[in-house]
Amino acid sequence: MPKHRKQSKIKIYRITNYKKDKRSELDSNKFELEQQAVENKQDKQGKQDNQVQSENVVIVPTDSHNLDIWDEISLKEIQAGEHTNLFAEQSNYQNINLLQVSDIRLYLDKQLQFSSVDEQIYHEALVHPIMSKVIDPKRVLILGGGDGLALREVLKYETVLHVDLVDLDGSMIDMARNVPELVSLNKSAFFDNRVNTHVCDAKEFLSSPSSLYDVIIIDFPDPATELLSTLYTSELFARIATFLTEDGAFVCQSNSPADAPLVYWSIGNTIEHAGLTVKSYHTIVPSFGTDWGFHIAANSVYVLDQIEQLYVVPTPRTLPSLLFPLFQFKEEHLEQRNFALLNSESNLILHQCYKKEMEF
């Protein structure tokens, strides 16, 4: 899941109230979230904030202009109040805090990674479009995703016979396998016989010969540093494409088309420069305070043909059955494609774009 998010100039929305629902399967405390479509006319863009509402989640504006600061403040507030520390460790790569309040929250380096109230929105959007489009996916590779939540969604497909999950931080995988509350949330995904875990750098894993995959899911951290920017080069995307079957595809989390359009569209542009066909989409994630974007890519045009008209099976709990709305963008967001850049090993610039768009 993305590690960094925008220090936003617009109002950020935070989840402040939760109601338990015995019917939900979202997490161990059984919360229910129903995402409703939000329409906001362009001529009123400057007059009103997007409102995200659901039966069980109340979203209210906060005066914070810095989401990273808000994450750190919210973590301190939780730790000062009544809560349960489920897991706390300084690994070789990051500070990990998994806490339980009314929900379960994961913080990495004091930045919110997910809330159990709405993490399913992000993970269903990441996984289900590509898994439903690729015909009978049998072999899946997940790069990142050590919490097991994307893995949980992949394992819902009975056609899947083999999954390789690669994560740099072994502590993340240990937490996802051993903390009961997270095991409940990820549905014991790491104990499925189809799953093979690899604690190593993704580029190291991709440097070795391997069998091909029908689906590859890329859940890297955002390109906040020059090192992380190397995970989003045209060369690496081209390398990843060589691991795809003829009818295979990969999906990449790509930040927010609303808050970080240069980063979002530059990732898509970089994938295209690697010689792939790309389809772009997004969905609203309330705990992120914005919508979040993804790019699906394939070696052949026909693989992604008419994906917008696809009905997702198994039916997600937070996505529309028909994917068409996810592939629709506001005109002002689409216009930002004209400024998209190419990120390559010889010209690493994505982290600079990221830092510029994160500035207040």
UniProtKB/Swiss-Prot annotation:
Residues given in the record as spermidine binding sites: H123, D147
A cellular-component GO term for this protein: cytoplasm
Positions contributing to S-methyl-5'-thioadenosine binding: Q94, D167, D201, A202
UniProt keyword annotation of Cytoplasm present: yes
Chief place where the protein resides: cytoplasm
Keywords: Cytoplasm, Polyamine biosynthesis, Spermidine biosynthesis, Transferase
Residues covered by the PABS domain: 68-299
Cellular localisation: Cytoplasm
GO biological processes: spermidine biosynthetic process
Entry EC no(s): 2.5.1.16
Protein name, entry field: Polyamine aminopropyltransferase 2
Catalytic residues (UniProt): D219 (proton acceptor)
Catalyzed reaction equations: S-adenosyl 3-(methylsulfanyl)propylamine + putrescine = S-methyl-5'-thioadenosine + spermidine + H(+)
Record-annotated membrane-spanning stretches: none
Metabolic or biological pathway: Amine and polyamine biosynthesis; spermidine biosynthesis; spermidine from putrescine: step 1/1
Entry function: Catalyzes the irreversible transfer of a propylamine group from the amino donor S-adenosylmethioninamine (decarboxy-AdoMet) to putrescine (1,4-diaminobutane) to yield spermidine.
A GO MF label: spermidine synthase activity
Protein family: Belongs to the spermidine/spermine synthase family.
Keyword Cytoplasm among UniProt keywords: yes
CDD domains in UniProt: AdoMet_MTases
Description of how the protein assembles with itself and partners: Homodimer or homotetramer.
Pfam family of the protein (one): Spermine_synth
